[in-house]
Amino acid sequence: MKTKKLIVFLLLAYIPMMIVGFVIHKHAGGIDATSADANAIFAFLFSAGSMLIPLLAVVFTQLIFKEKVFDGCGVSLRFNRWWWIGWLLMPLMALVTFGVSLLMPGETLATDSEAVQQGLAQMGGAGLWGFIALSTFSGMLAGVTVNALFAFGEEVAWRGFLYKEFKGRKFLTAAVIIGVIWGFWHFPLILNGHNYPQHPVLGVFLMVLLCILLTPILMYFRKKSGTLIVPAIMHGTFNAVVGISNILVEPANDLLVGGPGLAGFIVLLLTNIGLLIYDHCCSREDIYLKEL
């Protein structure tokens, strides 16, 4: 990794993100996922659009250093079984996270919440499990389509550009560094109430931990599939289904419940351990333990 190149990329990725955070704070007063008023919609659209910032940072960094824009980033449409394995893993993790969330102190199933009641009313007699199934399936469809497109804007940077630049380093070392860069990149949104509305300052550091735990999983599938598209689909699907716990569990303490909470961290850690064991005992590639 060229230090000067990394600095240029970080400046191009972080400065526009800080501007986005300032604009959201100034014009919308923050991010409120529970509201549907004009300010909340503005904040949502602006924060969603910010996912394209890392893509632009990669493009301009490559142009500044006179290199091909997507050279070595792993953009390939060659399909293999790791595409659907990665896609299906995300809702499985979300459902396990939902179960673990219910085990957190003081958390219970939110069958009486307004969101759940509205969903159940729209589904007729399908019941709670039908609501969960439909929510999960809808999230999977969003994850492999529109969400994947936006996630690609980030993944070009994290699992494309940085993955390429950190080749030669130990897999887990690179994963931690990329996770830290990815996590802190979110700080303007976190301070505005994204993911951790109850604890925005502490949430900045929890988001870094979330990204550190999620990065090895996405990097593993990037390696196994041979394409950046798979982590983009996984990232998009994760974003789409990770909120199921926050809808179905109350009082939904953001430090405990859902993907960004303790429940999610436990599931991510177990998933990493599972992949490490599979990779060592079954595929015998030891990707987690070798260099990129």
Residue ranges and their predicted role:
Residues 6-18, 51, 85-94, 178-181:
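Alpha-helical transmembrane segments
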Residues 13-29, 97-102:
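Alpha-helical transmembrane segments of multi-pass membrane proteins
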Residues 19-65, 75, 81-91, 111-141, ...:
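Alpha-helical transmembrane segments in multi-pass membrane proteins
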Residues 70-74, 110-111, 283-292:
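Short, Lys/Arg-enriched, Gly/Pro-containing loop segments at transmembrane-helix junctions
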Residues 152-181, 223-227:
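Membrane-interface helix/loop boundary segments of multi-pass membrane proteins
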Residues 174-183, 230-240:
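Central hydrophobic cores of alpha-helical transmembrane segments
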